[in-house]
């Protein structure tokens, strides 16, 4: 880390740590951002030592700028970091990243105008490309330097390891910066495996070449002396054109960037291959119940890079699906953060969710709540179980007969008779009808005890004799004897009305 962090001196490092990441934000650049940028440059086969000077930062910006439109968020972040570092090297006072980008754009516009003015003054307004691999030699001639084996090795290694994952496209764009169609074909021919993907790429290139020929028909008539013929689709693809013709088109006035056109066709075909090698839709990316939030975010953004959609649609997918497809634990935390939360805040809040430590903490909180509720219920039940006692001797509440100070009541407390105690009382409790219940004979007490049975007509009307049924007047003494007053004595004690 020490070698990577040595790109800034003491004073420059102080200025670096005062620049904010976003306008009006609290977070500022730190030393770790330089370390991260150097690692990303190594991943893209770019020398991280270029970060030590302003000229090196300018070269890095020149290679990364064409990839901003089709690149990922990592390339954009890398470009912003290098642009801010360039301003620190140039001693340009900036407050945040946006201001640094504005300064870079302003400086680029000035350099373009200056180059155009210089070309106009010298009588040569041709915009000569200074990008590798077409360079200008000491005699002022534009010559081509073949693509280096190191670049080819980096490209082959990426294809073998990543197998046309979404990060292959920005890697190809960075390695093929300023390349001619011949260099691009060399890069494609070095891919040994994945011939099915290579065949799909060739079909896409043929389709784009046919579309180019349709939109750019050949002009009739001879070509004027000193002028080059217009390139056809096969010329752009490098199959019917020589290296000198390709260099001539790219350095002509006005130039025809056949290398950039061919690279766009290849990137279009690579997008189709990436979509085929990544069949998983972004809608199917869901966080597992025990999956860390960081791994879920990595899978989400990797699949999002393979989606063929505009940046606005991708932003909507990120804002909506990232929270919607999280597991219930993380979803609760993310909804509490609100819709304006940054990705860093989300990952910090969900750190450790789903692991054994988080599960143990949630279980401990749940158990503590259950225990507190149980204690409260037990205390409440204990209070409710305290009933007021009543004395059988005096009938007052607050004490029992054992501790009663009143004169002891004579006789049984149940039946009122003397000679025995309540525990030895053999008299059974009478019900509200005055009967001893349960009755082992007769009808139940709540039924009519003496139901009149239907009788036949008088005997004289049928000639059966003079005897008739029992007159109903004789039933009165029976009815009167159904509820004897003596039975109420066991229920209400000595009834004065019965005496």
Curated annotation (Swiss-Prot):
Residues 14-33 are annotated as: Interaction with membrane phosphatidylinositol 4,5-bisphosphate and RNA. The modification Phosphoserine is found at residue 148. Residues 12-19 are annotated as: Interaction with host AP3D1. Residues 277-363 are annotated as: Dimerization/Multimerization of capsid protein p24. The modification Asymmetric dimethylarginine is found at residues 386, 408. Gene3D superfamilies: 1.10.1200.30, 6.10.250.390, Human Immunodeficiency Virus Type 1 Capsid Protein, Immunodeficiency lentiviruses, gag gene matrix protein p17, Single helix bin, Zinc finger, CCHC-type. InterPro entries: Gag_p24_C (IPR045345), Gag_p6 (IPR014817), Lentvrl_matrix_N (IPR000071), Matrix_HIV/RSV_N (IPR012344), Primate_lentivir_Gag_pol-like (IPR050195), Retrov_capsid_C (IPR008916), Retrov_capsid_N (IPR008919), Retrovr_matrix (IPR010999). Residues 189-227 are annotated as: Interaction with host PPIA/CYPA and NUP153. GO terms for biological process: viral budding via host ESCRT complex; viral translational frameshifting. Belongs to the primate lentivirus group gag polyprotein family. A motif (PTAP/PSAP motif) lies at residues 454-457. A motif (LYPX(n)L motif) lies at residues 482-491. This is Gag polyprotein. Residues 116-128 have a biased composition (Polar residues). Late-budding domains (L domains) are short sequence motifs essential for viral particle budding. They recruit proteins of the host ESCRT machinery (Endosomal Sorting Complex Required for Transport) or ESCRT-associated proteins. p6-gag contains two L domains: a PTAP/PSAP motif, which interacts with the UEV domain of TSG101 and a LYPX(n)L motif which interacts with PDCD6IP/AIP1. A motif (Nuclear localization signal) lies at residues 26-32.
């Amino acid at each position: 880390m020490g070698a990577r962090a040595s790109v800034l001196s003491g004073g420059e490092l102080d200025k670096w740590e005062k620049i904010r990441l976003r306008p009006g934000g609290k977070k500022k650049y730190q030393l770790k951002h330089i370390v991260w940028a150097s690692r990303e440059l190594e991943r893209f086969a770019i020398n991280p030592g270029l970060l030590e000077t302003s000229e090196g930062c300018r070269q890095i910006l020149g290679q990364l700028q064409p990839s901003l439109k089709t690149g990922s968020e990592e390339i954009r972040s890398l470009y912003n970091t290098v642009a801010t570092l360039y301003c620190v090297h140039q001693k340009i006072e900036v407050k945040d990243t946006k201001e640094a980008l504005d300064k870079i754009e302003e400086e680029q516009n000035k350099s373009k105008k200056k180059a155009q003015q210089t070309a106009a003054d010298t009588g040569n307004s041709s915009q000569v490309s200074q990008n590798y691999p077409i360079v200008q030699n000491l005699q002022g001639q534009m010559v081509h330097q073949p693509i280096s084996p190191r670049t080819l090795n980096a490209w082959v290694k990426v294809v073998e390891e990543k197998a046309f994952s979404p990060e292959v496209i920005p890697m190809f764009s960075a390695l093929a910066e300023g390349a001619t169609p011949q260099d691009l074909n060399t890069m494609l021919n070095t891919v040994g495996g994945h011939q099915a993907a290579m065949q799909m790429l060739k079909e896409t290139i043929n389709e784009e070449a046919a579309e180019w020929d349709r939109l750019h028909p050949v002009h009739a008539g001879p070509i004027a002396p000193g002028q080059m013929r217009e390139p056809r689709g096969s010329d752009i693809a490098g199959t019917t054109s020589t290296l000198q013709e390709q260099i001539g088109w790219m350095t002509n006035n006005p130039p025809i960037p056949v290398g950039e056109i061919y690279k766009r066709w290849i990137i279009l075909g690579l997008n189709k291959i990436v979509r085929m090698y990544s069949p998983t839709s972004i809608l199917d990316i869901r966080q597992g119940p025990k999956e860390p939030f960081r791994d879920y975010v990595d899978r989400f953004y990797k699949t999002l890079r393979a989606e063929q959609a505009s940046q606005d649609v991708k932003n909507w997918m990120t804002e909506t699906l990232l929270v919607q497809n999280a597991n219930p634990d993380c979803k609760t935390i993310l909804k509490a953060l609100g819709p304006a939360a940054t990705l860093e805040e989300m990952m910090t809040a969900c750190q450790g969710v789903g692991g054994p430590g988080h599960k143990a903490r949630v279980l401990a909180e749940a158990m503590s709540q259950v225990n507190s509720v149980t204690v409260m219920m037990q205390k409440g039940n204990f209070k409710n179980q305290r009933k007021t006692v009543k004395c059988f001797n005096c009938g007052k509440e607050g004490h029992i007969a054992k501790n009663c100070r009143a004169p002891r009541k004579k006789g049984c407390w149940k039946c009122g008779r003397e000679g025995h105690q309540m525990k030895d009382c053999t008299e059974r409790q009478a019900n509200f009808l005055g009967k001893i219940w349960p009755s082992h004979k007769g009808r139940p007490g709540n039924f009519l005890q003496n139901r009149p049975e239907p009788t036949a007509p008088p005997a004289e009307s049928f000639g059966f004799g003079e005897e008739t049924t029992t007159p109903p007047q004789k039933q009165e003494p029976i009815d009167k004897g159904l509820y004897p007053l003596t039975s109420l004595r066991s229920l209400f004690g000595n009834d004065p009305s019965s005496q």
